[in-house]
Amino acid sequence: MIKKRIAPLVLGLWALLFLFTFPAIAEDDPEDGKSTNDSGPLTFEGFLEMENLFNAHKDQSFDDAVIKNEIRGKFKIRYGTDNAHVFLSPDLYLSSAVFQSESDKTCAYNDDFDVARNMRISDRGYEASLSEGYVHYGNSRARVRVGNQIYGWGTADVFNPTSYFNPYDMRETFFKDDDELKLGVPSISGMAFFEKFTVEMVIVPVHIPGILAEDGRYWEIHLDNYQLPIVFDDVHALSGGIENSAFGARVSSTILGTDVSVSAYHGPDKDFVYLPSRILVEPGEPVSVLVTPKTYPVSFLGMDFSKSLDSFVFQAELAYSPDKRTTLAQNPDSGEPIVFPYTVERSDYIAYAVGFNYFIPMHEWIEGHEGDTVLTMEWYQTRFLNRSRTEPVITDFISARFEDSYFKGRVPVACTCLVSLKNPGYVIWPRIGYDFQNGFSTTLSYLHLDGRSEALNTTESLFYYFRNNDSLIWKLHYDF
């Protein structure tokens, strides 16, 4: 009941911010007295999208194959000038879970009504989120933003080791649109523009944890190669306080034609430590192990590079932490008793991603071909440098993506492949679309996932646990 009362209050506060705070700062640039905005004080754009997801597993009825029917509306609203404005980018979702029984959680956004710290309001069948919603004030020398923000730190296309602030929405693992994967964080950011470099500083006063697929969801992870069932506990945000705030800085420059950035961060780790906490013994349920997603503070130093060379754009990111937490490894097959909860220790840690974009000159081979043909490839690896630590699950990935369009841009095609080498598994994701060039477009894609388990009581590739989740996805999209 309290949270249901908070929701209108949150929306009301944003309305007051929009109506009253903005006029106080929406002045023309004090340096020259002229606005640089030629499109008027209010701009509004966005899209509406219908998404339908079907499980492609054989030997099931059509009703069982239908997993999700969802309507999404995304809006981008800006009021003000280039120098001083309010920017809002809300996402509104409505899914078929509204009409399903409470016992069917396959595509539910949340078990119950909830208001998150970043103003994401969700229930079983609907969700409203504000990934970006901030007040902007600046000029040619500097700018300041206050509100929900997403930070595009890093240069890699798939995995970004130096993107520290924005946690991931993993309710559909990687199989969401790019603009849905990162959660906005309430923060204050400032950027100063110097002649040869740019400095950005960020403060996030409250912790925003990532989101995982909960029990009963289509993309829930079933660790079915363990002798005892694994049950995941709920995710909890860290308490308020300066000790759980995040701070970061980034210096960017161009040196000899290469874009270079150096960054530093201290605050809550956006990656969870999956801590085996205790044995669960409940009446009528099998004995199982409770795993709790925990968040700990972490420090990072990072660098990223981007270099254009003929038809190639090369990218690299590197992040190092002296104090990233993980659990001490225990071997269930050693014959020694397992001690719960597992011990959590600090460790030196390194993560890097290297890759390139190749703009293929397809017009040289296909007469009249228009548009960009791009091949993107990337290698991603993480390591704990101290021995006896539990090894990272998301590591040793090769990704490849091919994108092109035909018939004057009406038919876009793409194929993405992500391969896990350390824990064998892969996903292949071909897509084809048609652009009616009147605002409407449609896409059809297929997800094929597979992997293998090499031993009991070991964590395998994510794709192994989703081996029965081959899916067909159809979308109808309208831009306005």
Name each model feature, range by range:
Residues K34-S61, I67, A84-L88:
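Transmembrane beta-strand segments of Gram-negative outer membrane beta-barrel proteins
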Residues M50, G73-Y79, E132-Y137, I188-A192, ...:
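Residues on the lipid-exposed face of transmembrane beta-strands in outer-membrane beta-barrel proteins
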Residues M50-A56, T81-N83, L92-S96, N139-R141, ...:
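Transmembrane beta-strands of outer-membrane beta-barrel pores
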Residues F54, A65-I71, Y126-S131, S140, ...:
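Residues that define the transmembrane beta-barrel architecture of outer-membrane proteins
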Residues G80-E220, L447-S453:
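Outer membrane beta-barrel
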Residues N83-V86, R141-V144, K196-V199, G257-V260, ...:
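Repeated loop/turn-to-beta-strand initiation elements of outer-membrane beta-barrel proteins
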Residues M170, F356, F466-F480:
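Outer-membrane beta-barrel "beta-signal"
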Residues Y265-G267, S311-L328, P332-V419:
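Detector for outer-membrane/organellar transmembrane beta-barrel domains
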